[in-house]
Swiss-Prot record:
<dbReference type="InterPro" id="IPR050972">
    <property type="entry name" value="SDr-like"/>
</dbReference>
<dbReference type="Pfam" id="PF05267">
    <property type="entry name" value="DUF725"/>
</dbReference>
<keyword id="KW-0677">Repeat</keyword>
<protein>
    <recommendedName>
        <fullName>Protein TsetseEP</fullName>
    </recommendedName>
</protein>
<dbReference type="InterPro" id="IPR007931">
    <property type="entry name" value="TsetseEP"/>
</dbReference>
<dbReference type="GO" id="GO:0005576">
    <property type="term" value="C:extracellular region"/>
</dbReference>
<feature type="region of interest" description="Disordered">
    <location>
        <begin position="192"/>
        <end position="320"/>
    </location>
</feature>
<keyword id="KW-0964">Secreted</keyword>
<feature type="compositionally biased region" description="Acidic residues">
    <location>
        <begin position="194"/>
        <end position="308"/>
    </location>
</feature>
<feature type="region of interest" description="59 X 2 AA tandem repeats of P-E">
    <location>
        <begin position="194"/>
        <end position="311"/>
    </location>
</feature>
<keyword id="KW-0732">Signal</keyword>
<feature type="signal peptide">
    <location>
        <begin position="1"/>
        <end position="19"/>
    </location>
</feature>
Length: 320
Protein backbone atom coordinates (compact mmCIF):
# COMPACT_ATOMS: atom_id res chain seq x y z
CA UNK A 1 0.00 0.00 0.00
CA UNK A 2 2.79 2.36 0.90
CA UNK A 3 4.62 1.51 -2.29
CA UNK A 4 1.54 2.14 -4.38
CA UNK A 5 0.97 5.53 -2.78
CA UNK A 6 4.62 6.48 -3.26
CA UNK A 7 4.57 5.39 -6.90
CA UNK A 8 1.41 7.40 -7.56
CA UNK A 9 3.04 10.42 -5.94
CA UNK A 10 6.08 10.06 -8.19
CA UNK A 11 3.90 9.84 -11.29
CA UNK A 12 1.98 12.97 -10.34
CA UNK A 13 5.13 14.99 -9.79
CA UNK A 14 6.82 13.78 -12.97
CA UNK A 15 3.73 14.48 -15.06
CA UNK A 16 3.69 18.02 -13.78
CA UNK A 17 7.37 18.59 -14.51
CA UNK A 18 7.15 17.07 -17.99
CA UNK A 19 4.81 19.86 -19.06
CA UNK A 20 7.23 22.64 -18.10
CA UNK A 21 8.91 24.90 -20.63
CA UNK A 22 11.28 26.06 -21.91
CA UNK A 23 13.29 22.92 -22.42
CA UNK A 24 16.17 23.81 -20.13
CA UNK A 25 13.93 24.38 -17.11
CA UNK A 26 11.87 21.34 -17.89
CA UNK A 27 14.85 18.99 -18.03
CA UNK A 28 16.51 20.43 -14.95
CA UNK A 29 13.36 20.37 -12.81
CA UNK A 30 12.54 16.87 -14.00
CA UNK A 31 15.95 15.58 -13.06
CA UNK A 32 15.81 17.27 -9.67
CA UNK A 33 12.34 15.96 -8.75
CA UNK A 34 13.21 12.42 -9.88
CA UNK A 35 16.28 12.32 -7.70
CA UNK A 36 14.41 13.60 -4.64
CA UNK A 37 11.46 11.27 -5.18
CA UNK A 38 13.60 8.11 -5.54
CA UNK A 39 15.67 9.14 -2.55
CA UNK A 40 12.51 9.53 -0.52
CA UNK A 41 11.19 6.11 -1.57
CA UNK A 42 14.49 4.37 -0.75
CA UNK A 43 14.63 5.93 2.71
CA UNK A 44 14.39 3.30 5.45
CA UNK A 45 12.96 5.77 7.89
CA UNK A 46 10.07 6.43 5.54
CA UNK A 47 9.55 2.68 5.01
CA UNK A 48 9.18 2.22 8.78
CA UNK A 49 6.73 5.09 9.04
CA UNK A 50 3.29 4.72 10.52
CA UNK A 51 -0.05 4.65 8.85
CA UNK A 52 -0.50 8.40 8.50
CA UNK A 53 1.35 8.55 5.16
CA UNK A 54 -1.79 9.23 3.14
CA UNK A 55 -2.49 12.40 5.05
CA UNK A 56 1.09 13.58 4.47
CA UNK A 57 0.87 12.97 0.73
CA UNK A 58 -2.50 14.68 0.57
CA UNK A 59 -0.99 17.72 2.18
CA UNK A 60 2.34 18.06 0.37
CA UNK A 61 1.69 16.72 -3.14
CA UNK A 62 -0.44 19.75 -4.13
CA UNK A 63 2.21 22.07 -2.72
CA UNK A 64 4.99 20.41 -4.72
CA UNK A 65 2.89 20.57 -7.87
CA UNK A 66 2.20 24.25 -7.21
CA UNK A 67 5.94 24.94 -6.82
CA UNK A 68 6.62 23.21 -10.14
CA UNK A 69 3.84 25.20 -11.84
CA UNK A 70 5.26 28.44 -10.50
CA UNK A 71 8.69 27.51 -11.88
CA UNK A 72 7.10 26.74 -15.26
CA UNK A 73 5.25 30.05 -15.29
CA UNK A 74 8.40 31.99 -14.37
CA UNK A 75 10.46 30.27 -17.08
CA UNK A 76 7.76 30.95 -19.69
CA UNK A 77 7.75 34.59 -18.69
CA UNK A 78 11.53 34.82 -19.10
CA UNK A 79 11.36 33.22 -22.55
CA UNK A 80 8.56 35.56 -23.63
CA UNK A 81 10.47 38.65 -22.49
CA UNK A 82 13.52 37.49 -24.48
CA UNK A 83 11.42 36.91 -27.60
CA UNK A 84 9.81 40.36 -27.31
CA UNK A 85 13.23 42.00 -26.98
CA UNK A 86 14.52 40.21 -30.10
CA UNK A 87 11.47 41.25 -32.12
CA UNK A 88 11.86 44.85 -31.02
CA UNK A 89 15.48 44.96 -32.15
CA UNK A 90 14.48 43.36 -35.45
CA UNK A 91 11.88 46.08 -36.04
CA UNK A 92 14.51 48.74 -35.45
CA UNK A 93 16.71 47.25 -38.20
CA UNK A 94 13.82 47.05 -40.68
CA UNK A 95 14.09 50.78 -41.47
CA UNK A 96 17.77 50.46 -42.35
CA UNK A 97 17.03 47.34 -44.37
CA UNK A 98 14.51 49.21 -46.54
CA UNK A 99 17.02 51.96 -47.33
CA UNK A 100 19.64 49.37 -48.30
CA UNK A 101 17.12 47.58 -50.52
CA UNK A 102 16.71 50.78 -52.54
CA UNK A 103 20.45 50.97 -53.21
CA UNK A 104 20.65 47.26 -54.07
CA UNK A 105 17.72 47.64 -56.46
CA UNK A 106 19.46 50.53 -58.25
CA UNK A 107 22.59 48.38 -58.70
CA UNK A 108 20.53 45.48 -60.05
CA UNK A 109 18.65 47.79 -62.40
CA UNK A 110 21.83 49.22 -63.90
CA UNK A 111 23.55 45.89 -64.31
CA UNK A 112 20.35 44.28 -65.56
CA UNK A 113 20.16 46.86 -68.34
CA UNK A 114 23.68 45.93 -69.37
CA UNK A 115 22.85 42.22 -69.44
CA UNK A 116 20.02 42.92 -71.87
CA UNK A 117 22.43 44.42 -74.42
CA UNK A 118 22.82 42.12 -77.43
CA UNK A 119 25.78 43.85 -78.99
CA UNK A 120 29.06 42.99 -77.33
CA UNK A 121 30.43 46.51 -77.55
CA UNK A 122 27.31 47.99 -76.04
CA UNK A 123 27.35 45.34 -73.30
CA UNK A 124 30.89 46.13 -72.12
CA UNK A 125 30.34 49.85 -72.53
CA UNK A 126 27.31 49.66 -70.25
CA UNK A 127 29.22 47.66 -67.63
CA UNK A 128 32.04 50.19 -67.75
CA UNK A 129 29.66 53.11 -67.25
CA UNK A 130 27.77 51.51 -64.36
CA UNK A 131 30.78 49.94 -62.69
CA UNK A 132 31.85 53.03 -60.74
CA UNK A 133 28.30 53.81 -59.58
CA UNK A 134 27.72 50.18 -58.63
CA UNK A 135 30.99 50.00 -56.70
CA UNK A 136 30.14 53.16 -54.72
CA UNK A 137 26.64 51.94 -53.86
CA UNK A 138 27.91 48.44 -53.06
CA UNK A 139 30.57 49.90 -50.75
CA UNK A 140 27.98 51.92 -48.82
CA UNK A 141 25.74 48.88 -48.55
CA UNK A 142 28.63 46.75 -47.32
CA UNK A 143 29.73 49.28 -44.65
CA UNK A 144 26.20 49.79 -43.33
CA UNK A 145 25.55 46.06 -43.24
CA UNK A 146 28.76 45.44 -41.31
CA UNK A 147 27.76 47.98 -38.64
CA UNK A 148 24.26 46.52 -38.35
CA UNK A 149 25.56 42.97 -38.07
CA UNK A 150 28.01 43.90 -35.34
CA UNK A 151 25.39 45.84 -33.37
CA UNK A 152 22.75 43.15 -33.69
CA UNK A 153 25.17 40.45 -32.57
CA UNK A 154 25.95 42.38 -29.40
CA UNK A 155 22.31 43.20 -28.67
CA UNK A 156 21.02 39.69 -29.34
CA UNK A 157 23.80 38.18 -27.24
CA UNK A 158 22.85 40.41 -24.32
CA UNK A 159 19.19 39.47 -24.70
CA UNK A 160 20.09 35.79 -24.67
CA UNK A 161 22.22 36.21 -21.56
CA UNK A 162 19.42 38.04 -19.74
CA UNK A 163 16.95 35.33 -20.74
CA UNK A 164 19.27 32.58 -19.51
CA UNK A 165 19.86 34.36 -16.21
CA UNK A 166 16.11 34.84 -15.73
CA UNK A 167 15.42 31.14 -16.42
CA UNK A 168 18.18 30.09 -14.01
CA UNK A 169 16.65 32.28 -11.31
CA UNK A 170 13.22 30.74 -11.91
CA UNK A 171 14.68 27.22 -11.69
CA UNK A 172 16.61 27.97 -8.50
CA UNK A 173 13.54 29.43 -6.79
CA UNK A 174 11.41 26.43 -7.81
CA UNK A 175 14.18 24.05 -6.70
CA UNK A 176 14.54 25.70 -3.30
CA UNK A 177 10.81 25.66 -2.69
CA UNK A 178 10.51 22.02 -3.80
CA UNK A 179 13.46 21.05 -1.59
CA UNK A 180 11.77 22.56 1.45
CA UNK A 181 8.52 20.78 0.66
CA UNK A 182 10.28 17.40 0.21
CA UNK A 183 11.98 17.82 3.58
CA UNK A 184 8.68 18.62 5.26
CA UNK A 185 7.07 15.62 3.53
CA UNK A 186 9.81 13.29 4.79
CA UNK A 187 9.41 14.59 8.33
CA UNK A 188 5.66 14.16 8.07
CA UNK A 189 6.03 10.52 6.93
CA UNK A 190 8.39 9.74 9.80
CA UNK A 191 6.93 11.72 12.67
CA UNK A 192 3.37 12.16 11.54
CA UNK A 193 1.41 15.31 11.10
CA UNK A 194 1.92 17.83 13.86
CA UNK A 195 -1.11 18.58 15.93
CA UNK A 196 -2.74 21.70 14.65
CA UNK A 197 -2.25 24.62 16.92
CA UNK A 198 -5.47 25.97 18.33
CA UNK A 199 -6.52 28.96 16.46
CA UNK A 200 -6.56 32.01 18.65
CA UNK A 201 -9.99 33.21 19.39
CA UNK A 202 -10.66 36.34 17.49
CA UNK A 203 -10.76 39.30 19.73
CA UNK A 204 -14.22 40.76 19.92
CA UNK A 205 -14.47 43.76 17.82
CA UNK A 206 -15.03 46.82 19.90
CA UNK A 207 -18.50 48.12 19.60
CA UNK A 208 -18.50 51.18 17.48
CA UNK A 209 -19.06 54.24 19.50
CA UNK A 210 -22.36 55.86 18.72
CA UNK A 211 -21.87 58.64 16.39
CA UNK A 212 -22.65 61.93 18.02
CA UNK A 213 -25.81 63.43 16.79
CA UNK A 214 -25.05 66.21 14.44
CA UNK A 215 -25.63 69.53 16.02
CA UNK A 216 -28.53 71.34 14.43
CA UNK A 217 -27.36 73.92 12.10
CA UNK A 218 -28.07 77.38 13.43
CA UNK A 219 -30.87 79.08 11.64
CA UNK A 220 -29.54 81.79 9.46
CA UNK A 221 -30.14 85.18 10.93
CA UNK A 222 -32.58 87.24 8.91
CA UNK A 223 -30.83 89.69 6.81
CA UNK A 224 -31.40 93.23 8.08
CA UNK A 225 -33.61 95.29 5.90
CA UNK A 226 -31.63 97.83 4.01
CA UNK A 227 -31.93 101.25 5.56
CA UNK A 228 -33.66 103.76 3.31
CA UNK A 229 -31.27 106.06 1.71
CA UNK A 230 -31.52 109.56 3.22
CA UNK A 231 -33.15 112.06 0.95
CA UNK A 232 -30.65 114.57 -0.32
CA UNK A 233 -30.90 117.86 1.54
CA UNK A 234 -31.94 120.76 -0.65
CA UNK A 235 -29.10 122.91 -1.58
CA UNK A 236 -29.25 126.26 0.28
CA UNK A 237 -30.16 129.17 -1.89
CA UNK A 238 -27.25 131.48 -2.41
CA UNK A 239 -27.49 134.53 -0.16
CA UNK A 240 -27.91 137.76 -2.06
CA UNK A 241 -24.81 139.77 -2.20
CA UNK A 242 -25.05 142.81 0.09
CA UNK A 243 -25.55 146.04 -1.76
CA UNK A 244 -22.57 148.32 -1.47
CA UNK A 245 -23.14 151.06 1.09
CA UNK A 246 -23.21 154.52 -0.42
CA UNK A 247 -20.09 156.43 0.18
CA UNK A 248 -20.64 159.26 2.67
CA UNK A 249 -20.81 162.64 1.03
CA UNK A 250 -17.92 164.84 2.00
CA UNK A 251 -18.98 167.45 4.53
CA UNK A 252 -18.70 171.03 3.25
CA UNK A 253 -15.72 172.85 4.51
CA UNK A 254 -16.63 175.58 7.03
CA UNK A 255 -16.34 179.02 5.63
CA UNK A 256 -13.55 181.02 7.23
CA UNK A 257 -14.78 183.63 9.67
CA UNK A 258 -14.28 187.17 8.47
CA UNK A 259 -11.45 188.97 10.04
CA UNK A 260 -12.60 191.81 12.35
CA UNK A 261 -12.04 195.19 10.82
CA UNK A 262 -9.60 197.36 12.70
CA UNK A 263 -11.26 200.09 14.64
CA UNK A 264 -10.43 203.61 13.42
CA UNK A 265 -8.07 205.53 15.49
CA UNK A 266 -9.82 208.33 17.41
CA UNK A 267 -8.92 211.81 16.47
CA UNK A 268 -6.76 213.54 18.96
CA UNK A 269 -8.72 215.74 21.19
CA UNK A 270 -7.35 218.73 22.82
CA UNK A 271 -5.33 217.69 25.60
CA UNK A 272 -7.22 218.27 28.77
CA UNK A 273 -5.74 218.03 31.96
CA UNK A 274 -3.93 214.94 32.44
CA UNK A 275 -6.10 212.29 33.74
CA UNK A 276 -4.92 209.20 35.32
CA UNK A 277 -3.89 206.66 32.86
CA UNK A 278 -6.56 204.10 32.37
CA UNK A 279 -5.60 200.59 33.08
CA UNK A 280 -5.03 198.59 29.98
CA UNK A 281 -7.90 196.37 29.06
CA UNK A 282 -7.19 192.72 29.35
CA UNK A 283 -6.46 191.03 26.15
CA UNK A 284 -9.34 188.90 24.97
CA UNK A 285 -8.72 185.20 25.34
CA UNK A 286 -8.30 183.46 22.06
CA UNK A 287 -11.26 181.40 21.07
CA UNK A 288 -10.77 177.64 21.44
CA UNK A 289 -9.93 175.90 18.26
CA UNK A 290 -12.69 173.66 17.00
CA UNK A 291 -11.95 169.95 17.10
CA UNK A 292 -10.75 168.70 13.78
CA UNK A 293 -13.42 166.91 11.89
CA UNK A 294 -12.56 163.77 9.95
CA UNK A 295 -10.84 164.48 6.72
CA UNK A 296 -11.68 168.21 6.46
CA UNK A 297 -8.87 170.63 5.95
CA UNK A 298 -7.69 172.36 9.07
CA UNK A 299 -9.22 175.75 9.67
CA UNK A 300 -6.90 178.71 9.68
CA UNK A 301 -6.21 180.03 13.09
CA UNK A 302 -7.91 183.40 13.72
CA UNK A 303 -5.57 186.28 13.87
CA UNK A 304 -5.39 187.95 17.27
CA UNK A 305 -7.23 191.18 17.59
CA UNK A 306 -5.00 194.21 17.57
CA UNK A 307 -4.48 195.67 20.93
CA UNK A 308 -5.58 199.33 21.28
CA UNK A 309 -2.70 201.61 21.45
CA UNK A 310 -2.47 203.50 24.68
CA UNK A 311 -3.30 207.08 24.49
CA UNK A 312 -0.29 209.21 24.12
CA UNK A 313 0.45 211.62 26.77
CA UNK A 314 0.54 215.23 25.70
CA UNK A 315 3.99 216.55 25.61
CA UNK A 316 2.78 219.85 26.60
CA UNK A 317 -0.27 221.61 27.45
CA UNK A 318 -0.37 223.30 24.12
CA UNK A 319 -0.31 220.39 21.76
CA UNK A 320 -2.50 220.89 18.75
Amino acid sequence: MKFFISFAFLCLVLSCVAALSPDQVESRLKSYVENRSFALLRSGRVARAGTNTVQCYDKYVPLIRQAAAEGKFASDKCAQEGQNAREEETKKSEVIRESLNVKVASIEKGLGACVAKYDVLEYFTCLRDHASESQTAAGEVGKTSAVIVEGLNIVLTNIELREKYCIDQAFEQAQEKSDILFTELENCLIEGLPEPEPEPEPEPEPEPEPEPEPEPEPEPEPEPEPEPEPEPEPEPEPEPEPEPEPEPEPEPEPEPEPEPEPEPEPEPEPEPEPEPEPEPEPEPEPEPEPEPEPEPEPEPEPEPEPQPEPESKPNSLFNF
